[in-house]
From Swiss-Prot:
Subunit text: Part of the 30S ribosomal subunit.
Family designation: Belongs to the universal ribosomal protein uS14 family.
Name of the molecule in the record: Small ribosomal subunit protein uS14c
Native organism: Amborella trichopoda
InterPro entries (alphabetical): Ribosomal_uS14, Ribosomal_uS14_bac/plastid, Ribosomal_uS14_CS
UniProt keyword annotations, A-Z: Chloroplast, Plastid, Ribonucleoprotein, Ribosomal protein, RNA-binding, rRNA-binding
Family matches, as PROSITE patterns: RIBOSOMAL_S14 (PS00527)
The organism's taxonomic lineage, starting at the top: Eukaryota, Viridiplantae, Streptophyta, Embryophyta, Tracheophyta
One GO CC term on file: small ribosomal subunit
Function statement: Binds 16S rRNA, required for the assembly of 30S particles.
Subcellular location: Plastid, Chloroplast
GO biological process: translation
Length: 100
């Protein structure tokens, strides 16, 4: 189980990303549309003004049940070992064990 502070920090980053998403997207469109390099540099400076944690690259997918940041399956929102336990216990409909 991940520490609660790490999970809360990740939620805070998600809220910041949602808040500044439209601003970042509009600035990126402006950069792609402007032909002059000096104007692009000015807009790029504006792009750096929002908080660092509002960037989407800083987000991590976390396991829904344990909060583990690694080995997450996007389809289920679970980490690998929790997914395996739930499949073995038949708690995930449609998921089957494979062996070859």
């Amino acid at each position: 189980m991940a520490r609660k502070s790490l999970i809360q920090r990740e939620r805070k980053r998600q809220k910041l990303e949602q808040k500044y998403h439209l601003i970042r997207r509009s600035l990126k469109k402006e950069i792609s549309k402007t032909p002059s390099l000096s104007d692009k540099w000015k807009i790029h400076g504006k792009l750096q003004s929002p908080p660092r944690n509002s960037a989407p690259i800083r987000l991590h997918r976390r396991c829904f049940s344990t909060g583990r940041p690694r080995a997450n399956y996007r389809d289920f929102g679970l980490s690998g070992h929790v997914l395996r336990e739930m499949v073995h216990a038949c708690l995930l409909p449609g998921a089957t064990r494979s062996s070859w």
